[in-house]
Each structure stands twice: as C-alpha cells, then as structure tokens.
C-alpha cells in the first residue's frame, strides 16, 4: 500500500495488484457498490480501478481509498498500555464499532489489530477490505479466511456470510479487557 497525495492535497492509500486473482475485480466492484451506500465513520471510501497501472504494456488494477491517518490498533496499544483511561476509551470505541458492524448486512472478513486504525482523535476506522462479505456475494466461497490468530478456528471457505466477524470481535474485545486486569499480558502474549 502506498500513500499518495492528489492535486487537491488529499491523501489516499493506493494498493497495487501485480498478479491476477480470479474474481478479484468482480468482488471488489461488489464491495465498492455496497460500501458506496453506507455512510459510516468506521469505513473509508474505496474505488476499484480495473486498468489503472501500466507496466511493460501490461495493465493492472489498483484499489484507491482515503488515507486513514493514525496508528494500527496494535501499535496504539503499545503506546497507551500504561494509561488506563486511554485503554478504557479504546475499549469503549471498539465496542461501539463492534455493535455497529454486527448490525450491518456485511462483514469485514479480516478483523485484526493491523486492519483497525486508531485515528489521532481516538476514533477507529477499518482498512483492508479484501476479505469482505457483502450481500451480493451470498452463496460464494470466501476468497480468504482472515488472519489465523483472529478467526474462528472452525471457519472454512464455505462459511462466508455476515457473521464471519463475530469471533474476531469477541477475541479482540476480550483481549482488550484482559489488559485492564493485567497490562503485562501485552508483552507476554501480544
């Protein structure tokens, strides 16, 4: 992922794909269409540009989304681990994100600390929509299963629906709450 600035001074994240993956274009179009109808501070506008990058006469797709300024959840945790008030605020913000996400007809599909950005004001935003499920994908198999450390160990490719975020939400929330009880868990297990 590259950070770039447009002519208006706005920052974007640009993800370049150097290999063709079957169904990627179709699925990203479905994701972009679904997310275009959602107004939420937890999501970033995203566009899939099918033939945007030219290398040696080959055309490659790119993904363009707004840049989320902040720190990944894991880096932010290491920064605030000694500040119980900041940790409680983070837990509260993650609960709110979780309640919102669980009420949606879609799922992120790869919830993990690296895909949650803590913005400078403490609010949270999700990034990396590769594994996302949207209703138009009903009946498809998962393109990816999410990170092993944060997915349901029983999850399979056929388990691809709006409920795939349930397990990682519980896992992350419990982990955050355990840090209130013992901040040393972060250095021991984190």
Annotated model-derived regions:
Residues 98, 102-119:
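Catalytic-loop of the protein kinase fold
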Residues 42-88, 139:
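Conserved structural core of kinase catalytic domains
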Residues 1-44, 56:
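ATP-binding glycine-rich loop module of kinase domains
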Residues 140-154:
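Conserved activation segment of eukaryotic-like protein kinases, specifically the C-terminal portion
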Residues 178-190:
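Helical subdomain adjoining the active site within ATP-dependent kinase catalytic cores
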């Amino acid at each position: 992922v590259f950070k770039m600035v447009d002519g208006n001074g706005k920052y974007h994240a640009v993800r370049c794909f150097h290999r063709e993956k079957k169904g990627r274009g179709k699925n990203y179009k479905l994701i972009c269409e679904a997310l275009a109808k959602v107004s939420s501070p937890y999501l970033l506008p995203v566009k899939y540009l099918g033939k945007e990058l030219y290398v040696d006469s080959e055309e490659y797709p790119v993904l363009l989304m707004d840049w989320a300024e902040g720190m990944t959840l894991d880096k932010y945790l290491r920064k605030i681990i000694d500040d119980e008030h900041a940790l409680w605020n983070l837990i509260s913000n993650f609960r709110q994100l979780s309640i919102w996400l669980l009420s949606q007809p879609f799922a992120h599909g790869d919830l993990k600390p690296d895909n949650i950005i803590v913005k400078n004001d403490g609010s949270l935003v999700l990034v990396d929509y590769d594994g996302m499920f949207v209703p138009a994908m009903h009946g498809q198999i998962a393109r990816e299963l999410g990170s092993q450390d944060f997915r349901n160990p029983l999850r399979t490719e056929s388990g691809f629906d709006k409920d795939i975020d349930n397990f990682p939400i519980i896992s992350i929330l419990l982990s955050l709450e355990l840090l209130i009880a013992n901040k040393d868990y972060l250095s021991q297990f984190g």
